[in-house]
């Protein structure tokens, strides 16, 4: 689809800076405009993207807009990365840095995680500590931005941000990542997909090592448990390991979130053996289980006392 550049103000600006957008077209990723080459054309392309509310673009779209080969475009982009005008979180994907972004090296990831994952063609959800903070767990200072995805991706740092990808098997992910169990985080750049309260707690119980350990999970459950729908919690729990569900049920009980805990009791009745509350301390030998309290309702060995005050 082609769209001629007729707006007189933009034409005037384009001629004044020595680069004229000559045609716009829609691509699968975003709308791009072709420019006549000229000194600083990439800089002006970035300004135009920002004026249209887009703080990101792909290498292919940028090179197409400027009429440059990929090698020439990459060289120009590298110069702007050095000048801290651009950031490059993934090969072929660029972030445009506004002056306020340059201080910390990149915008808040919630502004660009959705277009990045669309560029990579991978479904996702923001979860764990960042999702808990979004839903109101004020104790969660989300120093890391955690994303659950059905493919194994490398973590990376960009500016002061740490992006951590948590792998979930494709089958389980497809069953869990359903609209009824997800929410949206709105930012100036659009929307990003986030785990709902129920998934946030289940993910924290499942990936507890990445949620500040069992004590971090306990704090999340204390803060968010009352807001969870018992129905959604029980439905989503069908797709998680039984031990993780029992761990969450126990913590809900400790926090006196009775309705939510009751929704998970059927999972405890299915359990065949006792499991440690905190597997990070290792399996508890049978000879040492007498040293720990046991919760027979949830079939858990309480091998780590909780520090959270419920």
Regions found by a protein language model. Name each.
Residues 1-38:
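Short, intrinsically disordered or compositionally biased N-terminal tails of bacterial proteins
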Residues 26, 181-310:
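Hydrophobic alpha-helical interaction segments
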Residues 33, 38-123, 229-231, 235-239:
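Short beta-edge/loop segments at beta->alpha junctions of small alpha/beta modules
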Residues 67, 81, 136, 140, ...:
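Hydrophobic/aromatic-lined pockets within catalytic cores
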Residues 98, 149, 167, 196, ...:
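Pocket-edge structural micro-motifs
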Residues 110-115, 132, 147-149, 178-186:
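Short acidic (Asp/Glu) patches
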Residues 124-177:
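Exposed, interaction-prone assembly regions rather than primary DNA-binding/catalytic cores
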């Amino acid at each position: 689809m082609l769209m001629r550049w007729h707006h007189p103000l933009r034409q005037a600006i384009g001629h004044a800076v020595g680069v004229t957008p000559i045609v716009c077209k829609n691509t699968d990723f975003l709308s791009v405009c072709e420019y006549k080459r000229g000194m600083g054309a990439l800089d002006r392309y970035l300004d135009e993207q920002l004026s249209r509310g887009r703080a990101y673009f792909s290498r292919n779209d940028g090179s197409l807009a400027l009429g440059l080969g990929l090698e020439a475009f990459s060289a120009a982009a590298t110069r702007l990365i050095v000048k801290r005008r651009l950031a490059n979180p993934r090969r072929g994907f660029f972030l445009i840095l506004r002056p306020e972004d340059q201080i910390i090296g990149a915008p808040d990831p919630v502004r660009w995680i959705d277009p990045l994952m669309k560029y990579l063609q991978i479904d996702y959800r923001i979860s764990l500590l960042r999702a808990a903070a979004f839903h109101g767990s004020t104790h969660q200072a989300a120093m890391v931005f955690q994303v659950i995805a059905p493919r194994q991706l490398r973590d990376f740092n960009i500016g002061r941000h740490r992006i951590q990808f948590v792998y979930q098997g494709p089958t389980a992910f497809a069953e869990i990542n359903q609209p009824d169990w997800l929410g949206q985080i709105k930012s100036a750049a659009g929307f990003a997909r986030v785990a709902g309260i129920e998934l946030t707690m289940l993910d924290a119980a499942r990936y507890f090592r990445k949620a500040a350990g069992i004590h971090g999970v306990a704090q999340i459950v204390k803060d968010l448990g009352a807001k969870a729908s018992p129905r959604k919690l029980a439905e989503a729990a069908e797709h998680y390991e039984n031990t993780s569900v029992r761990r969450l049920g126990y913590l809900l009980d400790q926090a006196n979130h009775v309705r939510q805990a009751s929704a998970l009791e059927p999972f405890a009745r299915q359990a065949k053996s006792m499991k440690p509350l905190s597997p990070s301390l290792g399996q508890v030998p049978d000879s040492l289980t007498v040293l720990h309290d046991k919760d027979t309702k949830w079939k858990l060995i309480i091998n780590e006392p909780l520090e959270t005050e419920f």
